[in-house]
Design a protein with these regions (language model features):
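Glycine-rich phosphate-binding active-site loops on the catalytic face of alpha/beta enzymes
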Residues: 131-151, 188-197, 238-256
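N-terminal active-site wall of soluble small-molecule enzyme domains
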Residues: 53-54, 59, 65-167, 175-178, ...
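Active-site beta-loop-alpha junctions enriched in small/polar residues
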Residues: 10, 58-62, 95, 122, ...
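A structural motif
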Residues: 12, 86-87, 137, 184, ...
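Catalytic cores of alpha/beta
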Residues: 124-135, 171-182, 220, 224-243
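An N-cap/entry alpha-helix motif that binds or orients negatively charged groups
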Residues: 2-70
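C-terminal helical cap(s) of enzyme catalytic domains, especially alpha/beta-barrels
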Residues: 206-210, 249-272
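Catalytic-face loop-and-helix region of soluble metabolic enzyme cores
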Residues: 186-243
Length: 272
């Protein structure tokens, strides 16, 4: 059983303990209205606040592949540093067992920053989209590898219908074909194989060649450590990047945000 299979099995157990509730576009829209609306996640990536790439900076304490990434973990402080440094959006891990995330982190960060937020988790049930709104997310991650076509379309329609952005994540050509069938405007290519957790940055370029990039905002995810990595991915067609581990390992998070985002090259930090 792969790590991904284990994570999904755990999610199924967690969801089995929750009350059964119907989730509709109308119920989700009512939730969004009650909390005061949505920050536009996709628009924030298309028009970066700083630098030359839409940067989704991830708040992540641990992962199955890396273990504890940041022992001195203060999610709100990290989120505020990301925002101040110019990140376009934030990704917040809410999975507790495998990534040491928490719904509370998302709630707290919602109150502390003004940029759009992604609930980073393994969505296999419509109730998780309702949770995402309740906890403060403006976008949800839909991982094609763990959803059949019917659920993928259902969850995409629910999220987008409610006004959220849906980041549809793929890793290979077969998954990309399924995402394209949705006409998803926001597609993430995960350079990490979630079955083996190995990373290959060339994955983004290979799959980007199959996309109409005038109709799709492409996000490159995983394995991004240097500005050279970012420029390689931009040349492949990525307009945005999602970065977690390499930011979390920095003593000076803000400087790394500026470096990856291109601010130290094109922006005010030109002499750094």
């Amino acid at each position: 059983m792969s790590i991904l299979d284990k994570i999904v099995a755990t999610k199924q157990q967690e969801l089995a303990a929750l009350p059964v509730t119907a989730v509709t576009v109308d119920s989700l829209r009512a939730q969004v209205a009650a909390r005061g609306g949505v920050r536009d996640f996709m628009a924030a990536l298309a028009e970066p606040r700083a630098g030359d790439v839409g940067l989704i900076a991830e708040v992540k304490k641990a992962s199955p592949s890396a273990g504890i990434i940041r022992p001195d973990f203060d999610p709100v402080q990290i989120a505020q540093e990301y925002e101040t440094a110019g990140a376009s959006c934030l990704s917040v891990l809410t999975d507790e067992q495998y990534f040491q995330g928490s719904p509370e982190y998302l709630r707290q960060i919602r109150e502390a920053v003004d940029v759009p937020l992604l609930r980073k988790d393994f969505v296999i049930d419509a109730r998780q989209i309702a949770e995402a709104i309740e906890w403060g997310a403006d976008a949800v991650l839909l991982i094609v590898a763990i959803l059949d076509d019917d659920r993928l379309r259902e969850f995409h329609d629910l999220a987008v219908g409610a006004g959220l952005s849906a980041l549809v994540e793929v890793h290979d050509a077969e998954e990309l074909a399924r995402a394209k069938a949705l006409e998803a405007p926001l597609i993430g290519v995960n350079n990490r194989d979630l079955k083996t957790f190995t990373v290959d940055l060339d994955t983004t370029g290979k799959l980007a060649a199959e996309l109409d990039l005038s109709q799709t905002l492409l996000v490159a995810e995983s394995g991004i450590h240097t500005r050279a990595d970012v420029e390689l991915l931009q040349a492949s067609g990525a307009r945005a990047i999602l970065v977690g581990e390499s930011l979390m390992r920095q003593e000076n998070i803000a400087a790394k945000v500026r470096e990856l985002g291109g601010q130290t090259v094109h922006g005010e930090g030109g002499h750094e």
